[in-house]
Amino acid sequence: MAQEKVFPMTAEGKQKLEQELEYLKTVKRKEVVERIKIARSFGDLSENSEYDSAKEEQAFVEGRVTTLENMIRNAKIIEDDGGSNVVGLGKTVTFVELPDGDEESYTIVGSAEADPFEGKISNDSPIAKSLLGKKVDEEVTVQTPGGEMLVKIVKIS
């Protein structure tokens, strides 16, 4: 039997996934079932776009429920080791781009909870891979979609 993938994440990340799962199971499923029921009342299902749309949404919701259940079941909570001198999962790292000094901060999280718009990047991302295990004042070459850039780590928290 194949071993299931482990999803490293913070406790906060797991809690957010559990909240999303609860919402999908208790609220969204009921909404979709109601939409299907209403669409069925329109009659002929062969050309009923409301019905097709509701069934597609139901498939998406059920797929997301399955995905979330798997991620939660196989979550590996990353505990903060208390030290903040090394870049690791769950840590926020601030660095400056050399030589111009543009400062950026990211929290490194498991892929299941990554959200670049919230400043959370996956530990599997090229930037995180370059930074993991490094310390304050280290200069690191980071791979980005735009090419390589040299950064200096200024803070880890």
Swiss-Prot record:
Pfam families noted in UniProt: GreA_GreB (PF01272), GreA_GreB_N (PF03449)
Coiled coil: 50-70
Induction pattern: By heat shock, salt stress, oxidative stress, glucose limitation and oxygen limitation.
Superkingdom of origin: Bacteria
UniProt-listed InterPro entries: GreA/GreB_C_sf, TF_GreA/GreB_CS, Tscrpt_elong_fac_GreA, Tscrpt_elong_fac_GreA/B, Tscrpt_elong_fac_GreA/B_C, Tscrpt_elong_fac_GreA/B_fam, Tscrpt_elong_fac_GreA/B_N, Tscrpt_elong_fac_GreA/B_N_sf
One Gene Ontology term from the biological process aspect of the record: regulation of DNA-templated transcription elongation
SUPFAM superfamilies cross-referenced by the UniProt entry: FKBP-like, GreA transcript cleavage protein, N-terminal domain
NCBIfam families reported in the protein's UniProt record: greA (TIGR01462), PRK00226.1-4 (NF001263)
Function according to Swiss-Prot or TrEMBL: Necessary for efficient RNA polymerase transcription elongation past template-encoded arresting sites. The arresting sites in DNA have the property of trapping a certain fraction of elongating RNA polymerases that pass through, resulting in locked ternary complexes. Cleavage of the nascent transcript by cleavage factors such as GreA or GreB allows the resumption of elongation from the new 3'terminus. GreA releases sequences of 2 to 3 nucleotides.
Protein's UniProt name: Transcription elongation factor GreA
Native organism: Bacillus subtilis (strain 168)
Higher taxonomy: Bacteria, Bacillati, Bacillota, Bacilli, Bacillales
